[in-house]
């Protein structure tokens, strides 16, 4: 698409970054001075009743700056990147029609990628193939199937943990149905996003600072009642660790503690480590991201002003 064609498209802003980087605070500040409406891009914030462990914006923050695509699902439900793209496009169209600019804020990079580049259609599930995969897993174990996936699709295998049967089964199923790997299919883009997008990433200047913020925030969550929040989910009886909601960072570790699998101290250690690993993956995505402007979260006023310099002109 030519620069002239891009300039005629409606505007949108991406505010991306690793967990605990200050994205929400900056987005709320920007909403005070720009004609923007916020859309959450977070695979954990979609779930109702999961507030503390996801660092969901507080009631007062949401009153000042409402977020769309927040609290839209029960934790028993699944939600795909394709679901997100469909819902985000609808919200963006509504915001644009009202004469305002969509500001998409979050850290689920797969959602941002799906929205920006589109998705190639994946084959629908086939119960017979899924049953065959699950039978093999029951007989030989998921570790064997994970090694099988390593031979078929090493990129997907590196991303999918052997203890994640839902995603592991789906990756194998896609290959058995289509003859193409999940990686091949997801690298084939669909319809590109019909917006002129200004992309920003916010993070501390050093990894050590980010690690400190992550550890501090995890302890703040514990002090704010995170254990009670997960115990309430556990007590429902219909949730389990195969669900995407309970596999969220922090929740999986707290669930293991509640089930008696690990000690409290081990839960804290694993929770902090898992959050740091998530942040590392997010930063790795962003370092390879084209057209992104980096902001220093340790200098919030400067970060805000940098966004305003770029976006201010298009917002008037």
UniProtKB/Swiss-Prot annotation:
Site (Interaction with substrate tRNA) at 108, 130
User: Which InterPro entries is this protein grouped with?
Assistant: Dimethylallyltransferase, IPT, P-loop_NTPase
Query: Which residues are involved in binding ATP?
Result: 17-24
**For this protein, what reaction is catalysed?**
adenosine(37) in tRNA + dimethylallyl diphosphate = N(6)-dimethylallyladenosine(37) in tRNA + diphosphate
GO MF: ATP binding; tRNA dimethylallyltransferase activity
Q: Which cofactor does it need?
A: Mg(2+)
**Residues annotated to bind substrate:** 19-24
Give the first-level EC class, as a single word.
Answer: transferase
Keywords from the UniProt entry: ATP-binding, Magnesium, Nucleotide-binding, Transferase, tRNA processing
Q: Which GO terms describe its biological process?
A: tRNA modification
Pfam families given in the database record: IPPT
* Region ranges (Interaction with substrate tRNA): 42-45, 166-170, 247-252
Q: What is its EC number?
A: 2.5.1.75
Record field: transmembrane: none
Q: Which family does it belong to?
A: Belongs to the IPP transferase family.
Outline the subunit composition.
Monomer.
Q: Write down the PANTHER family for this protein, in alphabetical order.
A: TRNA DIMETHYLALLYLTRANSFERASE
Q: What does this protein do?
A: Catalyzes the transfer of a dimethylallyl group onto the adenine at position 37 in tRNAs that read codons beginning with uridine, leading to the formation of N6-(dimethylallyl)adenosine (i(6)A).
Write down what this protein is called.
tRNA dimethylallyltransferase
């Amino acid at each position: 698409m030519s620069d002239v064609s891009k300039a005629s498209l409606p505007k949108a802003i991406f505010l991306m970054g690793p967990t605990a980087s200050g994205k929400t605070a900056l987005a709320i500040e920007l909403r005070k001075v720009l004609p923007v409406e916020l859309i959450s891009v977070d695979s954990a914030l979609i779930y109702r009743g999961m507030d503390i462990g996801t660092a969901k914006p507080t009631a007062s923050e949401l009153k000042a700056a409402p977020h769309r695509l927040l609290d839209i699902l029960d934790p028993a439900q699944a939600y795909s990147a394709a679901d997100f793209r469909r819902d985000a496009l609808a919200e963006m169209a509504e915001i644009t029609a009202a004469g305002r600019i969509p500001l998409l804020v979050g850290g689920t990079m797969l959602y941002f990628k799906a929205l920006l580049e589109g998705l190639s259609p994946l084959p629908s599930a086939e119960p017979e193939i899924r049953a065959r995969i699950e039978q093999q897993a029951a007989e030989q174990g998921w570790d064997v199937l994970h090694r099988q996936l390593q031979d078929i699709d090493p990129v997907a295998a590196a991303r999918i943990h052997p203890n994640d049967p839902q995603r592991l089964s789906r990756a194998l199923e896609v290959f058995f149905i289509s003859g193409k790997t999940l990686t091949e299919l997801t690298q084939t883009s669909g319809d590109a996003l019909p917006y002129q997008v200004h992309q920003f990433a916010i993070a501390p200047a050093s990894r050590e600072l980010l690690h400190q913020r992550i550890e501090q925030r995890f302890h703040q969550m514990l002090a704010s009642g995170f254990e009670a929040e997960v115990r309430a989910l556990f007590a429902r009886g219909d949730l389990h660790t195969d669900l995407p909601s309970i596999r969220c960072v922090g929740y999986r570790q707290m669930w293991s503690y509640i089930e008696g699998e690990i000690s409290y101290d081990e839960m804290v250690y694993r929770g902090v480590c898992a959050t740091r690993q998530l942040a590392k993956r997010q930063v790795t995505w962003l370092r390879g991201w084209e057209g992104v402007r980096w902001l220093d979260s340790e200098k919030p006023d400067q970060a805000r002003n940098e966004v305003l310099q770029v976006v201010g002109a298009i917002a008037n």
